[in-house]
Amino acid sequence: MSIAIVYSRAQVGIEAPAVTVEVHLSNGLPSLSIVGLPETAVKESKDRVRSAILNSRFEFPLRRITVNLAPADLPKEGGRFDLPIALGILAASGQINVQRLPAYEFFGELALTGELRPIRAVLPAALTARDHGRALVTPLANAAEAALVEDLEVLPAPHLLAVCAHLNDSDPLPRYRAERSDGTQPEAADMAEVKGQEHAKRAMEVAATGGHNLLMIGPPGTGKSMLAARLPGILPPMSEQEALETAAIASISGNDFDPASWRRRRFRAPHHTASAIALVGGGSDPRPGEISLAHNGVLFLDELPEFDRRVLETLREPLESGVVTISRAARQASFPARFQLVAAMNPCPCGHLGDGSDRCRCTAEQVQRYRRRVSGPFLDRIDLQIEVPALPRAELLNRQPPAEDSNAIRQRVIAARAIQLERAGKANAHINHKERDRHCRLADSEQRLLERAMQRLNLSARGLHRILKVARSIADLAASPDIDAEHLTEAISLRRLDIRKP
């Protein structure tokens, strides 16, 4: 047979669309051409494939070879198609058995020696391959990642020869079997290590319960960064679907993805000099940015006013929708971005306003200019806005009874989050307007209290709705079916900070 078909998959956003590798051998001058809108890296695979076939002691056909990567309108990039192209050439030239090819999907970059090198974005391809009932043949280094998908036969191969021997039934590839780590190793950072700041710790607990965004403002050294780093340790565990989605994004980014920690919530803390592309994602071949890498986890923005204002404004839509869409001239890609934002900032340019040291010499105009670097619409999307004051030296030096550890807080958060999932199927921060009206009803007295707070604090409609969601989370922590005045008052106190006023 002078034609062969091999199955593989491309990568577009978080999706893995099917790619059919068609190889045809015909009479004519010896040549190898690849068609089907391949990128430069795919075109370069011609030389890699030829050398790999020859160094694996197969014959490279001295015929006119046409390789079509279908569908033709789907951009293909990277060396992931090296293995299926090589197998297609060997099958079309009759050197390997073609009967078993339809049962598998193949991925892998070939070294000149025929060894298989790892590729990125294997996990999205593995998820889709399972749904289509095919086994997966991958490089050995990608096996643990692909094996995260249950009910999928993963066959890791170290070399092109091993794949060919498997297809010829002479030496079957062993199925990869690995214990699926739950990824729930104890967090090194414990909330008990933070001295004092009980009000801030309570805000962290409420934020973790409902998935709310949080802004902390206070002088340097008050524990803002410590508190933020401990938020993942009190968040409830991810579901299997959430964990796989998060792991798939890490797989696409290719930044040292560790299958052993696939269930751990991510904590991302980009520097304030990060560009919009670094934060949101982009590039000619769209890659996920920090907000997608923090999907189902925590995105910590320290020194918030130091970020470029235009960069911060790009976060407004993902904060609402939980998705970021990157559009380029040739393609469009969407990545999930349902992250929990935690931001921290100083109260003034020098940072010492209100710390009791009398070191601050900033004028009121300088303070206002500093705080106005963060726009009102962006602040409106942050549910909790609290002050983290400097602690008295005596409180820092005195021995105090052990503070509550992260595990104790986490158990309360898990119980409250279970109430939310049973009620609405999602965290309180993500409920829509209809669900909010249904689940956040107030009695007349609480309604009047909220109206007074709205007038006094000059709240927008979005700010009002976010207070209701926070109050619902506080009520869930108390296992209360109704929002009472105490819950509403605490929710208002967690948002009453006006960072515009020095």
Question: Where are each of the predicted segments found?
Answer:
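Basic, amphipathic alpha-helical bundle interface domains used for macromolecular binding and assembly
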Residues: 35-46, 59-61, 68-78, 285-286, ...
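P-loop NTPase nucleotide-binding/switch module
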Residues: 168-206, 210, 238-291
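Walker A/P-loop
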Residues: 216-256, 321
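Residues immediately C-terminal
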Residues: 112, 299-300, 306-307, 393
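Peripheral, non-AAA+ core regions of ATP-driven protein-machinery
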Residues: 1-215, 219-226, 327, 463-464, ...
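Walker B catalytic acidic pair
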Residues: 296, 302-303, 314
